[in-house]
Amino acid sequence: MIRNTLAFLAILFLLIPTALLIIGSVSVPSTRMTLAKVEGTEFGIFGTCTGNGTDCTETSFGYNASSSLIDDFYYKGDKRLVLSKVLITHIISAFLSFLSAIFVFFSIFLVNQAVNIINIIVVFITTLLTCLAFAIELVLFLPHNTWQSYVTAGAIGSDLIAILALCLRSVSISRIGQKSARLEHVDTMNSSYSSYKTDVKYPLALDDKLSSVPTLPKFHDALTSTSEFGPPSDSGDTVGTTQYPGDIKYATGYESTVASPVPSRVAKLSSRDTPSIIADYDEFRKSESSPSRSSVLSTSKPEVHETEGYCPHKTGNRPGFPSLNIPRTRPTTAGIANTQFDLEPYRNRQAGSISSEGTDSRFFDVENQVSVAQTPSVKPEMFPKTARPFAAIHANASSTQLRNTENITHPGIPNHFAKTTSSVFDEPPATRMPQTRSPVNDHSSFPSDLPIKGEMSTNMTGAPRVGSRNNSSNDLHAQAGMLKNVGNGPRNAPRNNSSNNLHAQGGMPMNMRGPRGAPRNNSSGDLHIQSGMPMNGRNGPRDTSRNNSSSDLYAQSGMHPNMNNGHRGAPRNNSSNDLHAHGGMPVNMRGPRNTSRNNSSSEFNAQIPMNLRNGPRNASRSNSSTDLFGQSGIPGNSRGMPTSPNSRNNSALDLSMHGIPLANNSRQFKRPSYGNMSRPSFELNGSRNPSHGSLNTAHAGMGYGPRSMMRDPQNLSNVPPVSNTLDQLSGNADFELPVRGNRNNRRGPGGNRMIR
């Protein structure tokens, strides 16, 4: 539809310039219409007229005007006669416009891209001629031209619109051409399929189309053919023929046999290429047997032999693999000493070790059997003392005998971990295993109080094996905070050595460096690096003095983000004052409230968000050093609980951590914030684990308790007594804890839960 509309528009805009050009061409001397008029002289395309049209020249192509009249025009050159002859282009343009309209009209009925392109070319030429005629009029008659000369400009515009319409029609024709081409292709495919069904008769009859078909070649012949190209031989291959990567054949001294992957029935034809004639439908209906066994079917009847069916549980009957040669009787005890293992499975055996199918099967032994060959004599160098027959011993010895025998090893591998016991087999002494001592089971070379490898994976209490001081020091470094590393025993038993080794194993999962020196001060100086710091192992002490290590301790212990906080001064009081702000505090880096030692020690425990064990028992240096190494880095040890609320050094320093406010501490405890690197082991009351939330609420005090306890920090009635809290935590009392969440560990409305 759109193509026809565009065609009619093109015809319309081609007829308009035809009419305009005809109007411009009909002028004096034929009519009274003029292109220009100067001093009573009228100019047209074919001549001039004077005296109001009474005196006119003859009609001709080109004319000369008088010299007096030429001076009134812009162009006064000698070429005016030539240009006047070119005015004939008006008539030519009008004719081409009308001819183009006729072509476009006929193209409506003939939808062809080539015809449309020809129309575009003709209209374009017409437009060029019209432009030329309008230009000559302007050159000859300016400034005295009349309105009749400007109608040519309208013809030019109309021709351009016609060209645009024809271009749009060309695009539409190209699209319909592509669509018709696709439809034609589909029609061609459909017609081809229809003609095929017409030519072929359905249903196909065996006697019409498939009266005889060649059979497929034997599979094993195709694999073991002697020629790489061309048909293989009819007869079976023999030993010495060329083998290819796909062959399944093994030279064993006898005639080679090939295991065919065909599982049950194999048809052997007299000739591979002999066609086997298939019966037609009528013969198949009349016969009582299958067509392959009918007497009227084949010229050479195939010989069919039955083979054993494929059984995966039977060793050796796997498709594509030969049968196995395995002695079904186990070797006796008397023949074990004179047994030699065949350690070369790819070496050719003797002719006697052939299976019933004639195939060597050493490489395809899939059962847990041992194929042994009896030899008349065994040389001593061929049978090492430690090479005992592993499978044979297990085959003949009972479970009681195996528990009392030596450890059985693989051939050629000496056993250094075998027990020293007697053998139940009557064999010469030369063939017995060497008696060795096991470093795992022999405890004579180590102290009896030392933790043994393999027994320390679940002991995380840090309790010593024996009550001696050295032994507890030896055991403590291995059990405090070590989840996986259980093999790092002390270098030796002295007390200094355990202190030197303590910094490497206590609470350090990854950094296992040794001490910098043997003195106790050096181990104390290094202790701040490794205790409780999994990844940071570079902040050594400034010097070996005890004061300096205490000054640096607050900056390096447990601080992941802030690793550059040096001590503010060398005095002991200053390091104690700053210790509470930096030791074990990932986010809260507040300074001390005053310079007194008691205040800084008291607030040290209160400003550690979740670490309830790193606080010193009292303000003395020795006690803090004693408690610090045991409690830092132990995940589940909350031994920092106060023992008595009346003791100044012990309870007063620790009570701020457990909810007992101090007299000189008027600042309200705040809810702690956590950084990305130090996440506590359990959250607050909104914990996902209700037991952790309950325990936290029970002994956390005002810093972690309910909102009612945090409203008035000075009101001691809101704080549970320490003795009751200790009784509840030790299991001597029943209490209810506000726990947020239900039994499925989901966040929800809080409630009380009885805990015994």
UniProtKB/Swiss-Prot annotation:
Composition bias, Polar residues: 433-447, 593-605, 617-629, 640-650, 686-697
Glycosites: 52, 64, 190, 396, 407, 459, 470-471, 496-497, 521-522, 547-548, 573-574, 594, 598-599, 618, 623, 649, 664, 676, 685, 715
Modified residue annotations for Phosphoserine: 438
Single Gene Ontology BP annotation: cell division
Record region (Disordered): 281-328, 427-453, 482-650, 686-713, 735-756
One cellular component term from this protein's GO annotations in UniProt: plasma membrane
Any one Pfam family match given in the protein's UniProt record, by short name: SUR7
Keyword flag Membrane: yes
Localisation per UniProt entry: Cell membrane; Cell tip
Transmembrane spans: 91-111, 120-140, 148-168
Membrane topology summary: Multi-pass membrane protein
InterPro entries to which the protein is assigned, alphabetical: pH-response_reg_palI/RIM9, SUR7/Rim9-like_fungi
Residue ranges, compositional bias (Low complexity): 289-300, 485-520
UniProt KW keywords: Cell cycle, Cell division, Cell membrane, Glycoprotein, Membrane, Phosphoprotein, Signal, Transmembrane, Transmembrane helix
UniProt signal peptide: 1-24
Function text: Required for correct cell separation at high temperatures.
UniProt similarity note: To yeast YOL019W and YMR063W.
Protein name: Membrane-anchored protein 1
Species of the source: Schizosaccharomyces pombe (strain 972 / ATCC 24843)
